[in-house]
Amino acid sequence: MALEQIDYEYQSGFGNSFESEAIKGTLPKGRNAPQNCPLDLYAEQLSGNAFTAPRHTQQRSWLYRIRPSVCHTPLKPIDSGLVCDLNNLHVDPNQLRWKPFPITEDKPHDFVEGLITIAGAGHASVRHGLAIHIYTATKSMENKSFYNSDGDFLIVPQQGTLDIQTEFGFMKVKSGEICVIQRGITFSVNVEGPTRGYICEVFGSHFKLPDLGPIGANGLANPRDFLSPVAAYEKKEGIEHTKINKFLGKLFSATQTYSPFNVVAWHGNYCPYKYDLSLFCVVNSVSFDHLDPSIFTVLTAPTNEVGVAAADFVIFPPRWLVQENTFRPPYFHRNCMSEFMGLIRGVYEAKKEGFLPGGGSLHSCMTPHGPDSDTFYAAIKAELKPTKIPDVALAFMFESSLILGISDYAKKNFIDDDYWKCWQGLKDNSKI
C-alpha cells in the first residue's frame, strides 16, 4: 500500500500520561513491575529524566515487550558518515545561505545513512546544546533501526512522507507536519521515493509548549492537536536485525535476532508525537508594527535561564497581514540569538529569490540580516491593504541562544557565495 493511503490511529494531547495495549489485558493493573507480567512479557522502563527531577518535569514510560532491549551483540563503532560530534566546527560570522541539499538518487541510502550535520553548539556529554542536521533518503530501513543517546530529534519533513515505526507504535509524518522522537526511543523510517528534511536535535531539556502569558489559555499550538502512537507490535524471531546507536556524535552498530518493535503495551508520558503545522493558531498585530517572531513559536527547549531557549521551533505560516502604517516584512535585525532558517514550500516573505525549499540559512549572533533589497523597496511603496501570506508558503526557524559553528560538510558544500549581494541594492534614501 502506498504511504499516502496509510492512516494510523493516534492518541491526542501534549505531555499526557497515556496507556495503550495492542492486546487487551497486557498492561499490569496497579503496579509497574509485577513478579510475572501478563502473557509473560518483560517490563522495561524508559526514563527521559533523572528519577529525582521535579514531578512536573518528570518523563518516563513503562514498556511491556516480548524480549527486553538488552538482548543484542556488543555495540561496535561504524563509519559515522556525515554525522559529526561538534568537536571540530568551523567558525564563520558571515550571513550564510545554502542551496537545496541534493538527494543523491544514484546512491540508494536510508534515513540514517542520509544524516548530515550542518551546525551546532555545546555537546551531548554535558547535556547542553543542539545540533542541526539535514536528512535525505531514497530507500526504507529494512531490518534496521536507530536510537539516539545524545538527544531528542525534532524532524521537519520537506519532501516526501516518513512512515515511522517506533517502539510505541506507528506515525505517518508528511511535509507540513513535524514529529519529535526523544532520546533513547528506537525507530525505523520507511519512505517511498526521494525524501528530504531538517532535524533540530537538543541535548538537554525536552521540547515543551511555550508559555502563552497575556495571550491567554488558547492559541499558537494547542495541546489537543499533538498526536502520539498507539501500541503496535511485531513478533519476529530468528532474523538478523541491525540496531544503530548515535552516542556522543558517533555511530555504533549491534545485531540482534528479533525485532525491537515488540512492545505489546505501554503507559507513560515519554513517547514520540507528531503535529500538523496547519493547525497552528497564529497571533499577530491587528493595528500596527511587525511583532517579534517569538509569537510564532510552536515548541521550545528551555535552558536553565528563564525565558532563554536552547532551541525554539518557529514557523512562518499562511496568515493575514493587516497592520497600518507599518513596514510589514521582517525588520532589519541584529540578534543575540542564532537563527537557522529552512523553507518547506513556497517563497519566504523576506527573500523573494535564492532562498529555496530544501536549502537553509544561518544568521549568527549579532550578524546583521533582514529583507533583501527588492523586498524592502517593494514594501515601502506597497498599498497597505489586507494581504494574505499564501497557503503555499511555509518557512521555519530553529532559533538558539547558543552561538553555532558549522560542520566541515556545510562549510564546503552548497554555500551560496553570492548571498551577501542581496542587500547591496539598499541605498542611502535619507533626506538628510
Swiss-Prot record:
Segments forming a coiled coil: none
Catalytic activity, reaction form: homogentisate + O2 = 4-maleylacetoacetate + H(+)
The enzyme's E.C. designation: 1.13.11.5
Lineage: Eukaryota, Amoebozoa, Evosea, Eumycetozoa, Dictyostelia
Cofactor: Fe cation
Highest taxon of the lineage: Eukaryota
Iron is among the record's keywords: yes
Pfam (any one): HgmA_C
Binding locations of Fe cation: H333, E339, H369
Protein name: Homogentisate 1,2-dioxygenase
GO terms for MF: homogentisate 1,2-dioxygenase activity; metal ion binding
Pathway named in the protein's UniProt entry: Amino-acid degradation; L-phenylalanine degradation; acetoacetate and fumarate from L-phenylalanine: step 4/6
Protein's organism: Dictyostelium discoideum
Annotated keywords: Dioxygenase, Iron, Metal-binding, Oxidoreductase, Phenylalanine catabolism, Tyrosine catabolism
SUPFAM superfamilies on file: RmlC-like cupins (SSF51182)
InterPro entries in alphabetical order: HgmA_C (IPR046451), HgmA_N (IPR046452), Homogentis_dOase (IPR005708), RmlC-like_jellyroll (IPR014710), RmlC_Cupin_sf (IPR011051)
Family note: Belongs to the homogentisate dioxygenase family.
GO process terms (BP): L-phenylalanine catabolic process; tyrosine catabolic process
Cross-referenced NCBIfam families: hmgA (TIGR01015)
